[in-house]
Amino acid sequence: MAYSACFLHQSALASSTARSSPSSSSQRYVSISKLVCKAQQTHEEDNSTVSRRLALTLLVGAAAVGSKVSPADAAYGEAANVFGKPKKNTDFTAYSGDGFQVQVPAKWNPSREVEYPGQVLRYEDNFDATSNLNVMVTPTDKKSITDYGSPEEFLSQVNYLLGKQAYFGETASEGGFDNNAVATANILETNIQDVGGKPYYYLSVLTRTADGDEGGKHQLITATVNGGKLYICKAQAGDKRWFKGANKFVEKAATSFSVA
């Protein structure tokens, strides 16, 4: 159509020129008609190019809408989920005991060692027995954990949880210990929270011994009273391993403890 329009336009101009203008004028009009023709052709070529690009864009867009993103695809810096299944937290295993439940580090093993009165559960780190979890259940005449007083007062009544001093004798003050003392305990934090209508005590304690090679032990204690029983969960790790990542396992285990 572009060339046909150009031919008709050029013929009309030429015949009009032949009747009214000299030869030189005819050449000028023909030249203009050629430019018009060229412009029309270029315009149609541009339209054709735009149409092809538009069609390609629509095709790509339709393909994107019609396809599903593969679960294995991952953004830069992220690991691909090759099998396309939702990721689960495999660091902990849920444990349900008689009247309580707790999240136990998955790489810790059950232990038969009995260290505390009323102990019903014990798990230890596969590579370091200093990192462990214990649950104790003992009878009590208290109706609530708050009947023991403040968290600090409660701890003084169950101080056996922190371990006993094995050596008794005269010693000089050394390494921050008092005279004749080879062990110390510092309460780092206490907290009281209501869970399911029951108050819970949370305590963070750092214990140290003169011969300890771990720089001390971080001990987290969770306690509550339910149905005439005192429930205590104690999780701990050595100070050195605490700052190398063991803290997240101990903290999760202690704070996950709850009674039915």
Swiss-Prot record:
Question: Does the keyword Phosphoprotein feature in the UniProt annotation?
Answer: yes
Q: Which UniProt keywords apply?
A: Chloroplast, Membrane, Phosphoprotein, Photosynthesis, Photosystem II, Plastid, Thylakoid, Transit peptide
Subcellular location per UniProt equals: Plastid, Chloroplast thylakoid membrane
What GO annotations for molecular function exist for this entry?
calcium ion binding
Entry superkingdom: Eukaryota
Modified positions (Phosphoserine) are S150
What conditions trigger expression of this protein?
Answer: By light.
Annotated Gene Ontology cellular component terms: chloroplast thylakoid membrane; extrinsic component of membrane; photosystem II oxygen evolving complex
What Pfam families does its record include?
Answer: PsbP
- Indicate where this protein is primarily found: plastid
Transit peptide located at which residues? 1-74
Q: Which GO terms describe its biological process?
A: photosynthesis
Role: May be involved in the regulation of photosystem II.
Q: Which family does it belong to?
A: Belongs to the PsbP family.
Name it. Answer: Oxygen-evolving enhancer protein 2, chloroplastic
The scientific name of the source species is: Sinapis alba
